C-alpha cells in the first residue's frame, strides 16, 4: 500500500495596518489671514494715536512732538515689515505669526508703564525727549505687529500665479484695519475711554487673539501658552495699576485738579502738566495768576466801574475770568468758546461751574464757533487758548484776527495770553499780525514767581482806540511796552496767515 503524502499548504499572512500619518499643519484660511492683518495693522495705528495723548502730559502737544511720534512709529513699521519677511522665510511662519501676535500684545501692555516711568524725566527737554520716550514705549510693539503682514503673506503664497491677488488682498485688509483703527480711536475710543484703559484693552485683545490663533493652528505648545497667559495677567495688572497723572483724560488734555496751598476752597487746574487756572470755589473775584490780573485790569479800563461787559472768551480752562467778570461786572454776558467738552464737564462737576446767561459755554473749535457770534456784539474778546506746549495756530492768523474784529464793537478790546521764551519769535509774529488789523497794539511781559520777565506769559492788547491802560498795584513788576515800543519789538515779526503759520517753529520753550 502506498502511503499518501500530505502536501503542506502555504499559510497566508495578513500584514498589520500601517499607522495613520500624523495630521498636517492646519492651513490658514483666507478669512483668518485677512482678520489677522486687519487686527495687527489697526492696533498699530490705534497705539500711535493714543501715544500722542499718553505722552502729552510730559512732552506737550505740538506739531514737532506729534511729528516725532509719527516718524518713530513709521520707522518701527518699516523695520518690522523688513525683519518679519526675513524670519518668515527661515522659520515656521505659523508659529512665528502666533508668537508675533502674542508678543505685540504683551509689548502694548508695557506701553503705559514705560511712559509713566520715563515721561517725568522727559519734561522740558524738547523733541529729542519725546522721540526717546516714543522709541522706548511704542516702537517695539509697532515693529513686532508690523512683522505679521509679511508672515501671513508667506503662509498664503502657495501659487505664484495668484501672488498678486493674495498680496493685494492682504494689503487691502491691512489698510482697512489701519483706517478703522484711526477713525475708531479718534471718534469713538478717546471720547469713550481713558487712554490708559484703551491701551490696556488693545494689548489684551492682541495677546488673547494670538493664543486663540495658536490653538486653532496647533502652533503653540502647552508651556508656551502657559507662559503667555502668565505674561498677559502680569503685564495687564501692571498696566492697570500704574497711577495715571490725570483726573480726567479728555480728547485734548490730561486734566488734573490740585488743592491750592493756603486756600481753603481753591483749586489749581493742571492741563498736560501746566498750571492752567486758579479757581476759588467760594470767591470768584479772587484771581491769583498774574496774567489773569493783567487781563482783568485791561477789562476794567475798557469798562470802568461795574459796567456790564459783553465778552467772548476763546478758551475756557477753569473759567476763572468769565466767573470773575460775572462777579465784578454784574449783568455781563460771556460766551466761552471751549473745544473740550469733557473739560467743561469737569468744570461743572468739580469746580462749581453753573452755565447761565452770564457764563455760557459753547463747545466746539473757536475758529468755527466764532462764525456764529453776531458782528459788533462784543466789548472784549479774550484769547486764552494757548499754553507753553499747545498752540492752536488757527487762532493766531490774520484771517482769524479779521474775524475777531468783525465780532468786536467799535473800539473794542482784543486781549491774548500768549506764552513764549527766548527770542520771542512767536510773540513778535503775533504782534506783527495784530498790527495789520488794529491801530493800537501793546505788549505786557508778565513776571514769573521770581519776578523774571525774560519769558512766560505775555499779554497782547489790541484796540482801535488810543487807549491808555491803568493797572492795579498787585500787577506791578511787569515789562510794559507802549504802542511805539511794541512796534519796534515786532518790526521784523512774521505775518501769520492761514497758509503760512509756523508757530511750532517760532515758539521757544524753556530748556528746549
Regions found by a protein language model. Give the residues of each.
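Alpha-helical transmembrane segments of multi-pass membrane proteins
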Residues: 2-248, 259, 263, 273-276, ...
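Soluble small-group transferase modules, centered on the S-adenosyl donor enzyme superfamily
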Residues: 220-278, 284-288, 298-302, 442-512
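Second-shell loop/turn segments in exported
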Residues: 281-285, 388-391, 416-422
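Conserved class I S-adenosyl-L-methionine
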Residues: 306-317
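Short alpha-helix immediately C-terminal to the canonical SAM-binding loop
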Residues: 344-345
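Short loop/turn elements that flank and shape the SAM/SAH-binding pocket of Class I
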Residues: 367-371
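A short, conserved alpha-helix within the catalytic core of class I
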Residues: 389-403, 426
Amino acid at each position: 500500500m502506498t502511503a499518501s503524502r500530505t502536501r503542506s499548504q502555504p499559510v497566508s499572512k495578513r500584514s498589520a495596518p500601517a499607522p495613520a500619518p500624523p495630521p498636517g499643519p492646519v492651513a490658514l484660511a483666507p478669512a483668518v489671514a485677512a482678520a489677522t492683518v486687519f487686527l495687527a495693522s489697526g492696533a498699530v495705528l490705534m497705539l500711535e494715536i493714543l501715544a500722542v495723548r499718553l505722552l502729552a502730559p510730559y512732552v506737550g502737544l505740538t506739531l514737532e512732538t506729534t511729528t516725532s511720534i509719527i516718524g518713530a512709529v513709521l520707522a518701527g513699521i518699516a523695520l518690522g515689515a523688513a525683519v518679519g519677511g526675513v524670519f518668515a522665510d527661515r522659520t515656521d511662519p505659523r508659529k512665528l505669526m502666533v508668537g508675533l501676535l502674542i508678543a505685540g500684545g504683551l509689548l502694548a501692555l508695557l506701553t503705559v508703564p514705560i511712559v509713566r516711568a520715563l515721561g517725568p524725566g522727559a519734561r522740558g527737554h524738547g523733541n529729542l525727549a519725546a522721540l526717546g520716550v516714543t522709541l522706548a514705549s511704542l516702537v517695539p510693539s509697532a515693529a513686532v505687529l508690523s512683522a505679521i503682514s509679511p508672515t501671513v503673506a508667506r503662509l498664503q503664497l502657495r501659487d505664484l500665479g495668484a501672488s498678486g491677488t493674495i498680496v493685494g488682498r492682504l494689503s487691502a485688509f491691512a489698510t482697512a484695519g489701519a483706517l478703522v483703527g484711526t477713525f475708531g480711536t479718534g471718534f469713538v475710543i478717546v471720547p469713550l475711554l481713558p487712554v490708559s484703559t484703551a491701551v490696556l484693552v488693545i494689548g489684551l485683545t492682541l495677546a488673547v487673539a494670538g493664543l486663540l490663533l495658536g490653538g486653532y493652528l496647533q502652533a503653540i505648545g502647552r508651556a508656551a501658552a502657559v507662559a503667555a497667559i502668565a505674561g498677559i495677567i502680569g503685564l495687564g495688572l501692571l498696566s492697570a495699576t500704574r497711577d495715571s497723572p490725570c483726573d480726567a483724560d479728555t480728547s485734548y488734555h490730561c486734566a488734573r485738579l490740585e488743592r491750592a496751598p493756603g486756600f481753603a476752597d481753591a483749586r489749581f487746574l493742571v492741563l498736560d502738566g501746566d498750571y492752567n487756572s486758579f479757581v476759588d470755589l467760594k470767591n470768584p473775584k479772587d484771581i491769583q495768576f498774574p496774567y489773569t490780573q493783567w487781563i482783568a485790569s485791561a477789562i476794567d479800563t475798557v469798562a470802568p466801574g461795574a459796567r456790564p461787559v459783553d465778552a467772548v472768551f476763546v478758551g475756557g480752562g477753569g473759567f476763572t475770568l468769565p466767573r470773575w467778570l460775572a462777579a465784578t461786572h454784574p449783568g455781563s454776558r460771556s460766551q466761552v468758546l471751549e473745544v473740550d467738552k469733557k473739560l467743561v464737564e469737569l468744570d461743572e462737576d468739580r469746580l462749581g461751574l453753573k452755565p447761565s446767561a452770564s457764563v455760557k459755554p459753547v463747545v466746539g473749535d473757536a475758529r468755527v464757533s466764532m462764525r456764529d457770534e453776531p458782528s459788533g456784539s462784543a466789548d472784549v474778546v479774550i484769547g486764552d487758548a494757548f499754553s507753553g506746549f499747545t498752540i492752536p495756530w488757527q487762532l493766531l492768523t490774520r484771517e482769524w484776527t479779521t474775524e475777531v474784529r468783525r465780532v468786536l464793537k467799535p473800539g473794542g478790546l482784543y486781549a491774548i495770553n500768549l506764552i513764549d521764551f527766548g527770542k520771542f519769535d512767536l510773540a513778535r509774529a503775533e504782534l506783527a499780525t495784530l498790527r495789520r488789523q488794529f491801530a493800537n497794539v501793546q505788549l505786557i511781559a508778565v513776571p514769573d514767581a521770581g519776578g523774571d520777565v525774560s519769558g512766560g506769559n505775555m499779554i497782547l492788547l489790541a484796540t482801535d482806540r488810543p487807549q491808555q491802560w491803568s493797572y492795579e498795584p498787585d500787577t506791578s513788576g511787569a515789562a510794559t511796552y507802549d504802542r511805539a515800543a511794541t512796534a519796534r519789538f515786532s518790526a521784523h515779526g512774521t505775518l501769520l496767515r492761514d497758509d503760512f503759520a509756523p508757530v511750532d517753529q517760532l515758539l521757544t520753550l524753556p530748556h528746549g
